[in-house]
Structures are given as C-alpha cells and as structure tokens.
C-alpha cells in the first residue's frame, strides 16, 4: 500500500536503498527480491491484457505521479492563501521561500544517499593503480628492498651471515668497493663467469633465445621460474600480487644469478615489448596474478637468461650429454632441444642459484650503460683507489683476451 505523498518509484527506492542499520548486509538480497517481485507482477499483468503494455503502464505511473504533484501544489497554494489572510505579504513570501528551501534540501538528501560498498577504499585505490600500470615491477622491487633494509632480511638464510647482501653496496664507499673486488675474484676463480655486458650488448646477445617465451606460454617446455611463480600465486589470497606479498617473496628464486637484477629487468622490459600481444590475450591465471610486467621480469627474463647461460658457459662440456654444438645460437635456432635439454637446464639453474650474491653485489654495481664506465672510474679516483685494479673495465678486457 503506497502511503500518502509517495509515488511508486519512491517506495521502491526506499525499499532497495534503505540506509538503516543492518540493511547493508541484506542489500543485494533486497535488490534481487525487489527485481523478482516487480518482474512477477508485470508478467502477470502482461499475460492477460494488452492495455497494460510497458508503454501504457509507464504512462499510467507518470500520470499518477503528475496527479500527486498537482495535488501537492494545490494544497500548498491553499495553505499559503490561508496564511496570507493573517500575515503581511513580506512574511508570507518569506515563509514560501523557507518552505521551498526545505523541500530542495530534502530532495538533495534523497538523491545523495551513498550506496554501501563491499571494497575498502584502500583496495579500490590499489586496483586503480594496477589498472593504470602504476604498480610496476621496479616500484615494487624498490619498496621491497627498502623494507628489507630496515628489517635486515634482504635474502633468505641460504647465505652465511658474513655474506648477507647489503643494498648499501650501491653507495660505493671505499670499503664496499674493496669487498666487491674480493667477491668478484672469489666467484670468478670458482665458476669462471663471463664478463658483464652493457645493456645494448646483452639485448643483442639474448635475442636469439627469446622464442622460449612463447614455448613457456604454450606449455611446450617446463620452467623452474614459472613453477615458483605458480606456487606464489596458489599460496596467495589476493586477486593480484600486492606490495606486501612481494616483500615476502624470496627473490633468490626469481633472480638470474650472476647476471644481476638490473640486467634481468632490462631483458624483461624487452620481452614485454616484443610479446605484448601474446601476453595480453589468453592469459593463464598465474600470469594474471603477477601482471605482465612482473611476469616478464621474474619468470620469462630469467628463463631467457638461463638459455643464454648455457650458451655463454658452454655447459654441455660439464654434462654427460653428447649434444655439443659449437655454432652461434643464430645458426642453431632450429636446435631448441639442445637448450631445452633438462640436464643442461638443471646445470644452469644450479649455477644461477649459486651466484645470486655475485649478481647483486658485483653485476648490479657494474656499469650497465657504456657512459657509466667513466663515472665509475671518476669515483675510484675520488676514493684514491687504483682504477686499473678496481674498475669493471679490467674484467671485461681480461676476460675477452
């Protein structure tokens, strides 16, 4: 039964968008019930009479509403006519204006009723950032590293205490540069690592190995990094990789060892550009959770560098496998089975895992652009350190010779 002064539409609105305490929990249910009740009444009316077509029903409702408005207007006019007999014209006009202002305020309150939302404001802002590509891998990595410095938990306990990573190595103090040389000499003698390439050189060298990206996406090859990424996704209760969860990740499992994170991220950027279309369409659940940028940086880039590692270090000599091609990778793109050989890839995975410390302390502080080499040498002169002995140039020249 519609109360006096209320239209049918107003009653429905109050029933569905009630803001009384406790109504938020039942909001969706009330909406569904309201829709079903209205639909049932309309279907019953439409089944028997053509006179109650949707257009005619709307006309009838509109006419009822118009009649009610006219009645309200007439009653208002009659009321003020009575008042005009007992008060001066100025007071009557003031009363009319006050009544109109009160009515406008009531209408504004009805229109501006806020709907209850299920998402918290911070969640909505995070989703907006993700949709606008504001939470890219570099920003997440930076925040995670800063947090880790505060907590003194950069890497897991896989390293001894005296070899725990310190991000302050990037500050290039004299002690840190001396320590860097010690780490470099230790790992170079133990693993015979190749020289660090500049970014343009690296991208040129790894280009022939990038087709592994499509093979991973199509499930043609198993991936150790994809396996770790999938586990992180399964253990999460979030719809996407959040900053907090990124901070909790063990980055050892997503780092391409001696290549370092800086060069790994450059490869990831190139992969994201080249395979943007394939990465956007038909995304697996793991890729959706990580996001394209982070998936390229921490899954596809290290897998590409794993293939490059097999080529650079000629790991077939350390394997019992009889496959020992000595061709340049551009000449053996049709020999994927060589670089996809499980035995060779396991050797590469082990090597990269064992050289994570080298990658962070040495590779990430080495110049990644050619013009940075001059800055490095200027810094060594400022600290009164021997340029030939401590500069990265020495290791590039010695290794090539």
UniProtKB/Swiss-Prot annotation:
Compartment(s) where it occurs, according to its Swiss-Prot or TrEMBL record? Cytoplasm; Nucleus
Q: What family is this protein classified in? A: Belongs to the RTC4 family.
Which regions are flagged for Basic and acidic residues bias? 35-48
Q: What is this protein called?
A: Restriction of telomere capping protein 4
Which portions of the sequence form the region Disordered? 35-59
Name the predominant localization: cytoplasm
Function, as annotated: May be involved in a process influencing telomere capping.
Cellular component terms per the entry's GO annotation: cytoplasm; nucleus
Q: Where on the chain is Phosphoserine found, per UniProt?
A: 23
Sorted UniProt keywords: Cytoplasm, Nucleus, Phosphoprotein
On the tree of life, the source organism's domain of life is Eukaryota
């Amino acid at each position: 039964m519609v109360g006096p002064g209320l239209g049918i539409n107003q009653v429905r609105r109050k029933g569905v968008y009630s803001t009384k305490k406790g109504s938020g929990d039942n909001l969706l249910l009330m909406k569904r019930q309201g829709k079903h009740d209205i639909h049932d009444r309309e279907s019953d009316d439409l089944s028997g009479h053509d006179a109650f077509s949707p257009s005619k029903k709307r006309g009838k409702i509109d006419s009822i509403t118009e009649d009610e408005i006219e009645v309200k207007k007439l009653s208002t006019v009659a009321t003020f006519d009575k008042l005009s007999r007992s008060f001066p014209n100025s007071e009557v006009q003031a009363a009319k204006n006050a009544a109109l202002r009160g009515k406008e305020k009531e209408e504004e309150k009805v229109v501006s009723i806020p709907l209850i939302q299920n998402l918290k404001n911070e969640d909505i802002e995070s989703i907006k950032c993700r949709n606008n590509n504001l939470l890219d891998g570099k920003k997440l990595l930076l925040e995670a590293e800063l947090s880790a410095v505060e907590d003194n938990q950069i890497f897991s306990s896989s390293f001894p205490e005296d070899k725990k990573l310190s991000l302050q190595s990037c500050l290039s103090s004299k002690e840190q540069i001396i320590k860097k040389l010690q780490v470099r000499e230790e790992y170079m003698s133990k693993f015979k690592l190749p020289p660090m390439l500049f970014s343009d050189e690296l991208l040129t060298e790894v280009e022939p190995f990038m087709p592994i990206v499509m093979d991973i996406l199509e499930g043609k090859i198993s991936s150790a990094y994809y396996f770790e990424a999938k586990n992180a996704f399964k253990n999460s209760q979030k719809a996407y990789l959040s900053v907090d969860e990124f901070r909790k990740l063990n980055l050892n499992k997503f780092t391409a060892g001696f290549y370092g994170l800086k060069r790994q991220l450059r490869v990831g950027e190139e992969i994201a550009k080249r395979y943007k279309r394939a990465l956007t369409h038909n995304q697996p659940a793991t890729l959706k959770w990580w996001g394209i940028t982070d998936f390229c940086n921490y899954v596809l880039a290290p897998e590409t560098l794993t293939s490059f590692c097999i080529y650079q270090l000629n790991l077939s000599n350390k394997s019992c496998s009889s496959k020992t091609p000595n061709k340049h990778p551009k000449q053996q793109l049709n020999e994927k089975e060589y670089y996809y050989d499980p035995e060779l890839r396991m050797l590469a995975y082990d090597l990269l895992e064992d050289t994570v410390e080298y990658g962070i302390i040495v590779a990430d502080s080495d110049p990644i652009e050619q013009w940075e080499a001059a800055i490095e040498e200027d810094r060594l002169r400022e600290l009164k350190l021997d340029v030939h002995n401590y500069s990265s140039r020495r290791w590039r020249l010695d290794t090539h010779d």
